[in-house]
């Protein structure tokens, strides 16, 4: 029996593979040494079954790193680097996203939540606010404030964020290397 299916499905496995490849260590060290991985692990368990939601409810609040993770749909392969003071509250986060510290992904009200595509890298201190859609393969620069939609393959920086470059997979082949595919 596959332990990942029992505990949280393919998304948990994709998260583990992503962390393992970037941190170069096994599950025990990831779980004990990296609170971001541990918190994400608990999130996946809560997502997987109502029993886990009840058992892990006390762990939902009071995280020492102030990592708040709340989304209706987070695909596998999410990597949170230094989750200190990071708030993630959105409709969707695509596969293989990378979020750095002090990032805020939030809503202007309960119905206007961000949608984050696949292979998005959100650098330290960036803010993604309101009913915005971030396309696939986007890089959001450090301390950028995104309040408008960002098309796929873009790099955005500044306050408010503006596109400084539109890339292609031909000019940036590394994106296909870091993507993780899990059945």
Regions found by a protein language model. Name each.
Residues 61-164, 168-169:
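Structural signal for interior beta-strand "rungs" in well-ordered beta-sheet cores
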